[in-house]
Amino acid sequence: MKSIRRGDGLNVVPFIDIMLVLLAIVLSISTFIAQGKIKVSLPNAKNAEKSQPNDQKVVVISVDEHDNIFVDDKPMNLEALSAVVKQTDPKTLIDLKSDKSSRFETFISIMDILKEHNHENFSISTQAQ
């Protein structure tokens, strides 16, 4: 009698390799998406510290090179920004990201709004040199 030879089966190692590469691509793309859509060239600082991620809610106020103001990637004017800050809990961290080409006057206007509403929990983002 002849014995029936079983097939070697399907080799899944190349499939696993492809899945790991795709996973790495998805993870790297998701970190770029999480950084925000507004392109802001931050000023440099020698003593810049990395912020420690935590579970605290953060409101991001960005100013682009054309002095446009964005709150969490939504365009706003100073009056609308004042209303948002007024509604924001004083314990909520506000992260200020101002483009190095923007006017300092816009930055000062935002600081005045924060002071007007007694919001002292904020950080100013810079880029380490």
Curated annotation (Swiss-Prot):
Cytoplasmic side: 1-12
Gene3D superfamilies, sorted: 3.30.420.270
GO MF, one annotated term: transmembrane transporter activity
Entry's Gene Ontology cellular component terms: plasma membrane
GO biological process: protein transport
UniProt record similarity statement: Belongs to the ExbD/TolR family.
Alphabetized NCBIfam families for the sequence: ExbD_2 (TIGR02804)
Function: Involved in the TonB-dependent energy-dependent transport of various receptor-bound substrates.
Full protein name: Biopolymer transport protein ExbD
The organism of origin for this protein: Helicobacter pylori (strain ATCC 700392 / 26695) (Campylobacter pylori)
